Amino acid sequence: MTNNLSGYRNKFVRVKTSRKRTVSSNNWLRRQLNDPYVAKARTQGFRSRAAYKLLEIHEKFKLFTPNMKIVDLGAAPGGWSQIASKLIKASDNSLNNKIISIDLLEIRPIVGVEFFQKDFFEEDTEKLIIQALDGKANIVMSDMASNTIGHKATDHIRTLLLCEQALEFALKVLKPSGHFIAKIFRGGAENKLLNKVKHEFRTVKHFKPLSSRSESTEIYLVALNKK
């Protein structure tokens, strides 16, 4: 699994406007049709281009090894769970080498992944995850983001709140020396969150994968070795 895009950069595809589509929908479709990572994901059988973001994070920080328990928050359509399953060599009958995935949207089965179609913020979901883990997690990862509205400050705050919730959960279920990965949007309000993360983990890094669109303000918070 590599991020080499040779052969995936196609000739620019124009999108015909339609009265049934909004301007933002047309822009999204144009990006999708001309995105080499979308084409590569389709060819290699990954659920989404986000799979390459996690792969790049792993290549940079060497996070995943066999015999891990992982929680994937906001998992649909399953790109991150797919990558994690391959990296830890997960299997459906292993108790100590598995991934627990949560999302409101359904995802198709993935080897070694136990999926719950639940709202992460419902009161009983946390108990359900903890029960399924049957112990502490090595990694909690979250690619959750709120539905963007195009207002950068609002999108920043909404996704930051999701990250804060994911962090609170991670601190409950991670083993000592466990890792936390989460998406945030840059915007200036993240300092309080970063200070808390730095207090709880030995190493905290920001990382923007090459597979993250250049115009996007998203970055990934990579917190290593929980104290």
UniProtKB/Swiss-Prot annotation:
Domain of life: Bacteria
Keyword rRNA-binding: no
Keywords assigned by UniProt, alphabetized: Cytoplasm, Methyltransferase, rRNA processing, S-adenosyl-L-methionine, Transferase
Pfam families: FtsJ
EC top class, as a word: transferase
Reaction(s) catalysed (UniProt annotation): uridine(2552) in 23S rRNA + S-adenosyl-L-methionine = 2'-O-methyluridine(2552) in 23S rRNA + S-adenosyl-L-homocysteine + H(+)
Function: Specifically methylates the uridine in position 2552 of 23S rRNA at the 2'-O position of the ribose in the fully assembled 50S ribosomal subunit.
Name of the protein: Ribosomal RNA large subunit methyltransferase E
